[in-house]
């Protein structure tokens, strides 16, 4: 067996495939590094503009002072504690128009969005009488609107409460801080009638836009020019339309679904960042780095199919290929992925794939013309390589059926090999015959292959 040319041929080809794994892994490392560079650019854009935004509010914040007594030893001692009681709206409606623009640093781009939001909230303050007690004193209330990054707050029109324009102040006005704005309510008995708040807010950010459905019943409608939204958070849109020109989505929720009425318990530590929210993220569809990385996962399949085609060609013809020729063709297939990565950063992934495929086919076509001693066989292999590139492109663009397509390719390739080699006597398989006057021994065949 160890002297069999077929054994050594299969062993050498297997070793060549394993050897080609080294440059493939190096290329995958380059892909990771380039993706990290792109992430650094996105972080730089985020640091120079504003980050993800999570809007909470509007809420009425009521400072409360409560007197209570405790028993200490033989006497009763009066104590006092202060906290903020948050009064949530009966209904909250948010209507937004989002415009996404791309910022570029070098060859990398990131997305920054600008949203014009209209907030409408109705507060039933008459029910605050439930909190009245002799030992409770209310302070001056104010309306709170919290955001994730105050740097993204742009133009804020004067809010109106029951038709009266009020002033708006920076900061949440809460002791625990937080980023946002607050609106002091006017002097007087503000509890005499329900409050209706209307305000417009320009908010910018990167990544996610989230709105906490604080109302007993909450609705949000958002229209955007970005065609690649990612709907995140705790609630999917009740309605959504996505097209090449952008998207429109509508969310609905109530306290029955989100339990926010109880979660906004009295106290200063509200943990708003963990509250459920309507969310949408401005994302990039599978970018060139993700697609190139996925493509490299099929590299071994491409190399194996090419080597298998060469092996069948050797088996059916008198032409013999040296292991170095296998290796050079394999390296050209590996270089396809590095060329694809480099081109995709400038031309886009589709254009890069076409150019890299044509360059690889041309390079192999010219080389195989000399190796296979003619243009006919060279053109057949070149067309086969282009066909394989097309199959790989189909695998990358059909994520849901990639397993089915990949399996089909392997089955067809194996069936084709079985068909064309069905009449071969593998025991009698040998290298091309030498001159008739000289007997061909097994050692001769093994020496020629090696």
Each language-model region and where it sits:
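Hydrophobic alpha-helical transmembrane signal-anchor segments
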Residues: 2-29
């Amino acid at each position: 067996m160890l002297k069999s040319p077929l054994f050594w041929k299969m062993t050498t080809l297997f070793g060549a495939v394993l050897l080609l794994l080294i440059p493939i892994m190096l290329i995958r490392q380059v892909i990771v590094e380039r993706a990290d560079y792109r992430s650094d650019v996105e972080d730089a854009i985020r640091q120079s503009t504003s980050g993800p935004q999570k809007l909470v509010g509007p809420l009425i914040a009521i400072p409360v002072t409560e007197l209570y007594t405790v028993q200490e030893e033989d006497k009763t001692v009066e104590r006092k504690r202060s906290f903020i009681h948050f009064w949530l709206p009966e209904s909250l409606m948010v209507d937004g128009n989002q415009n996404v623009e791309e910022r570029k640093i070098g060859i990398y781009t990131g997305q920054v969005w600008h949203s014009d939001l209209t907030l409408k909230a109705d507060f039933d303050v008459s029910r605050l009488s439930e909190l009245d007690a002799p030992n409770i004193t209310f302070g001056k209330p104010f309306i709170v609107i919290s955001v994730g990054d105050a740097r993204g707050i742009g133009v804020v029109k004067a809010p109106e409460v029951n038709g009266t324009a009020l002033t708006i102040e920076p900061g949440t006005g809460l002791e625990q801080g937080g980023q946002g704005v607050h609106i002091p309510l006017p002097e007087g008995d503000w509890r005499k009638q329900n409050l209706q708040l209307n305000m417009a807010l320009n908010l910018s950010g990167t990544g996610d836009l989230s709105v906490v459905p604080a109302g007993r019943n909450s609705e949000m409608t958002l229209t955007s020019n970005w065609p690649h939204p990612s709907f995140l958070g705790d609630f999917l849109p009740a309605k959504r339309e996505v097209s090449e020109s952008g998207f429109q989505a509508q969310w609905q929720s109530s306290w029955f679904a989100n339990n926010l009425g109880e979660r906004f318990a009295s106290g200063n530590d509200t943990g708003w960042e963990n509250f459920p929210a309507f969310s949408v993220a401005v994302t990039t569809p599978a970018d060139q780095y993700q697609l190139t990385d996925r493509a490299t996962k099929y590299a071994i399949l491409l190399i194996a199919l090419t080597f298998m085609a060469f092996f069948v060609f050797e088996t059916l013809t008198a032409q013999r290929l040296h292991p170095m020729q296998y290796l050079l063709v394999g390296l050209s297939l590996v270089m396809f992925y590095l060329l694809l990565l480099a081109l995709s950063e400038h031309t886009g992934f589709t254009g890069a794939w076409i150019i890299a495929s044509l360059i690889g086919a041309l390079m192999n076509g010219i080389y195989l013309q000399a190796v296979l001693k003619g243009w006919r066989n060279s053109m057949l292999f070149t067309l086969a390589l282009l066909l394989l590139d097309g199959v790989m492109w189909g695998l990358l663009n059909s994520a849901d059926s990639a397993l089915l397509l990949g399996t089909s390719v392997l089955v067809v390739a194996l069936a084709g090999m079985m068909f064309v080699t069905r009449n071969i006597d593998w025991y009698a398989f040998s290298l091309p015959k030498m001159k008739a006057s000289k007997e061909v021994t097994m050692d001769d065949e093994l020496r020629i292959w090696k």
